[in-house]
Amino acid sequence: MDVLRDVAAGKLVPASFQRPYVWRGPDVEAFWTSITKEWPIGSILIWEPDASVDVSRVGRTRLGPIEPAGEPKGIILDGQNRLATFAWSLRMPGDPMPDLSLLSEAEREVWGSKQLFVFDTHERRARFAHEDEVMGEHLIVPAGIVHDSTKLWPFIRKREKQIDISDEAITWLDHFGKAVRSAQCTTTILDRASPADALDAFRHIARVGVPMSEQDFADAMAWALEDAPAAPSL
């Protein structure tokens, strides 16, 4: 999925009005279960503003542990917990961690102690593991790289110098790589849309299940929405 490549490349950040990351361990496990069973994982709404919009003013500074290298191209209006979870799942042993004081309570609980979500070829299951365990006596692979051969195979080649890896383990991993690559997610991209267009899309597409009001959205982006209508009273 292109959106996952954009996450890995640091091209997407949550909208500034979004509440902090709130998923806990069971939510992460359910997310990866849906992917591995090839069930739909919901929808994502991304705004790619036109050149008149200062992305740094309407977006946050990072998605999970990933900070953009340069100006991000997209603002996540809906689906930030799913994409932030995938971003956290990309972490490799030894990768730098954000300052813990900058993480939400849920991020500190789930990821702050250098936990990774992994595919364990020995136990044949997906689970949480401390990053030190990933470099132990069995092949344990961070979940976020199983679909990307440019990251997966260098990791496997490195581990082959340290441990024995069976063909069955590789076959087991390959199944999950295919599942991630075929993940069913509806992605709507508002390409070069104005802030007013983004607000309109938010009202009509992301109304159900979005944990903020239209007024929250309008307030967060008011600097760029001088001509936008006020949010209706309820």
What kind of region is each of these model predictions?
Residues M1-G25, E29-L234:
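Basic- and aromatic-enriched surface patches that contact anionic nucleotides/nucleic acids
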